[in-house]
Amino acid sequence: MGPLMVLFCLLFVYTGLADSAPSCPQNVNISGGTFTLSHGWAPGSLLTYSCPQGLYPSPASRLCKSSGQWQTPGATRSLSKAVCKPVRCPAPVSFENGIYTPRLGSYPVGGNVSFECEDGFILRGSPVRQCRPNGMWDGETAVCDNGAGHCPNPGISLGAVRTGFRFGHGDKVRYRCSSNLVLTGSSERECQGNGVWSGTEPICRQPYSYDFPEDVAPALGTSFSHMLGATNPTQKTKESLGRKIQIQRSGHLNLYLLLDCSQSVSENDFLIFKESASLMVDRIFSFEINVSVAIITFASKPKVLMSVLNDNSRDMTEVISSLENANYKDHENGTGTNTYAALNSVYLMMNNQMRILGMETMAWQEIRHAIILLTDGKSNMGGSPKTAVDRIREILNINQKRNDYLDIYAIGVGKLDVDWRELNELGSKKDGERHAFILQDTKALHQVFEHMLDVSKLTDTICGVGNMSANASDQERTPWHVTIKPKSQETCRGALISDQWVLTAAHCFRDGNDHSLWRVNVGDPKSQWGKEFLIEKAVISPGFDVFAKKNQGILEFYGDDIALLKLAQKVKMSTHARPICLPCTMEANLALRRPQGSTCRDHENELLNKQSVPAHFVALNGSKLNINLKMGVEWTSCAEVVSQEKTMFPNLTDVREVVTDQFLCSGTQEDESPCKGESGGAVFLERRFRFFQVGLVSWGLYNPCLGSADKNSRKRAPRSKVPPPRDFHINLFRMQPWLRQHLGDVLNFLPL
C-alpha cells in the first residue's frame, strides 16, 4: 500500500576554502550581505552570496572562469554590483467563488492575505495566509468548494493560472505560473475514480525561495513512514522503540544514496552530505525492515561504493563504514555535475538485480525503491538526468497501479543557481506529498535528516491498513472489525481503535448486564486468528438514555449512542487484527499525509467534503457493504423522512428532536441498510489506500435481516415502503470532547 520512496535529495552549498593565489578579482562584496568561496579565488571556484533573513542576493552566485573573470550563471549581461533585495511572496492571479484581500501585485514578508467564500460554498484550506521570510506562504491553498464534483475542487495556488473547470471522473486540469515564477508539483492533474486528483498540488514559487527544515523533515518523514508501513502491513510494536515494521519475505526496500562530489561542492559540505546519509541509514535500519542500501558518489563520473547486490548492503555497520570511507579526493579531477550518470548507475544496478531474480518473479516485483541524491546544483554534463529516471521507471514498470514502488525526492541545498524546474522534473508526483525541496545550507540538511525518521514519534501510526488483495479474507480486508456478545449470542459490533480499546454503540449495553460476562471476538473467529477477550472496563456515554424523550412522544432516542470497551489484554497485531484510523489524531494525520499543524476541522473537510460521501460498514457475515453519507442540504432531506415514521415517533413535529447534528444519515439511492446486530460497527471511508472511521452504526428505519436466521440473507425494502429506509450513524467529529476525555492517553489528538 505504501510507497517505497525514492528520495532524490539535491543539495547545493558553496562555502569555501581561501586560496593564497587568487585568479579572479576580489572586489565582489555584496551590500548588506556576505559571501563564501568553494575553492578560493582559483578558476572553477563558486562564489555564493548570502543575505539576512527576509532578503535574497541578486545575483545568487558567480563562477570564476579560467580567464580570471567572474561569470554570473544564467545572466545575459554583466552585473556590476551584487545587492540584497527584499523577499516577496506571489499574489493570487484569481480566486474562484470568493474574494481575497488585500489585492497587491506581490506581498512583503509578514504580509497577510485573507480569503472569503460566496454563499453556498465552503472554505477549505487556510482563511488567512502569511508571507514567510523564505518567500513561501504559510498554511494551505484556500479553496471555495460546494462539493458538487466527483473530485473536490483542486483549487488554484497563489501565483498560478488554471485551465479546466470540470471535476468529474476523467476530467483534467492544467496549471502554469504567472510572471517569472517557477512551478513545482504537477502541471496536469486528472480526477481519478477514487475521487482523488492524480499527481501533486502545483505550487508557484519565486526562483530564490527555499524551504525551512521544519517543513521538509515532517514532509519527508510522513511519506517515508507511509512507505515503510505500506511495504508490508504486518508490523510489531516494541514499547522501548516505538513502532518497528517487520517486513516479511515478500517485502523489501532498496535504498540508493547518491552523493555529489563535484568541484563546486566544498570538502566540508561533502562531509555533511556523508553525515546526513549516515543518519538516514541509522534511522532506516532502526525499523528492522529488510533493506539493502547502495552508496554512490559522483562528479563527472560515478563511483559505486556499495551495491544492493552485495550482501553487505543489508548490514548497517558495513553500509555506514562505506559512507565513512567515501573520499572527497576520489573525484578531484572531475569538475562537472553528471547527475545523469549517477542515476544511470542506479538503473544498471536495478537491471542486474532483475536479471538475477527474474523479471516475472515476485522476488523482483515486490521490491520497493528509494533514491536519495545529494547534489550541489544543476547537472551540467552527461545529458538530461530525466532520461535516466525514465529508464528507471520503465524497468520498474511504474504505472498507476505500481506508482508506490518508486519515489524520487529532489532536495537542493543552498540558494545558488538551483534549477527548480530540474528538481521538479525529477521528483515524484504523488497526491498529498512533496518530492522537490531546496534547503538554505548543509546545516539545514543535517537538521532534516536528524528529524525526518524519529522512531519515537511514529508509535501507533500504522492504522487503517486492510489487505485488499483478491485472495484476502473479509476479516483481513477489515481487520479492525470485532463482534461483541453477552455469554453466547452476538449482539453488536465494534472497531479496534488501538491495541486494547474498542469503539462501539452505547445502546448495546442498555440492559445493564454484568459486563464481566461479556466477550469481544477479535480477528477471524473461523480461523486460528480469532481470539476471545474479556472486558476490563466499559465506558458508556453518560448522556445516552434511549427513553430520555419518551414524555415528548419520542419512544426511542439515540443521542450520545457511543461507548468504549477496554480489553483485559492487548491485541497482538496481525493481518487479521489491526486498529482503524480515527480522524483528528496524529496517527490519522500521517495516514492522510497531511502537514504538521493540521486540525480536526481539516480532517472533517477532507473526509466529508462532498454532499454525498461514499462509505462502508461491515455486515453480519463480515462482508463490506456500501452506503452514501449525506452532507449539507442532502443531510436535511435524508433526515426529513423520519417524520413519516409514526410508530416510533407518533407526535413528532421537529425532526431535529430525533435526528440531531450528532448523526450522519444514509439509506437513499441504492444504499445497503444495516441489520439489527450490526450496531456499533464502524462507518468508514477509504483514502489513499487507508481506512478512516467517521461514524458508528446506531439506528435505522428498516431491518433488512428481519425474519431471517441466515447471515447472508438481506432483503431490500419495497419501493413503496413508508417511510423509506434511512440509517443514522454517530458522527465521530461531533463526539470529540468525549473521545478526548477517555482516549487522551491512548491516541494523539490534533487541535480542534
From Swiss-Prot:
SUPFAM superfamilies noted in UniProt: Complement control module/SCR domain, Trypsin-like serine proteases, vWA-like
Keyword Cell membrane tagged: no
Domain Sushi: from-to ranges: 22-86, 87-146, 149-206
Top-level division of the source organism's lineage: Eukaryota
Record-given protein name: Complement C2
Entry's family note: Belongs to the peptidase S1 family.
Functional description taken from the UniProt entry: Precursor of the catalytic component of the C3 and C5 convertase complexes, which are part of the complement pathway, a cascade of proteins that leads to phagocytosis and breakdown of pathogens and signaling that strengthens the adaptive immune system. Component C2 is part of the classical, lectin and GZMK complement systems.
Enzyme class: hydrolase
The EC number(s) this enzyme carries: 3.4.21.43
Coiled coil feature spans: none
UniProt domain Peptidase S1: residue ranges: 464-744
Glycosylation sites: 29, 112, 290, 333, 467, 471, 621, 651
Locations listed in the record: Secreted; Cell surface
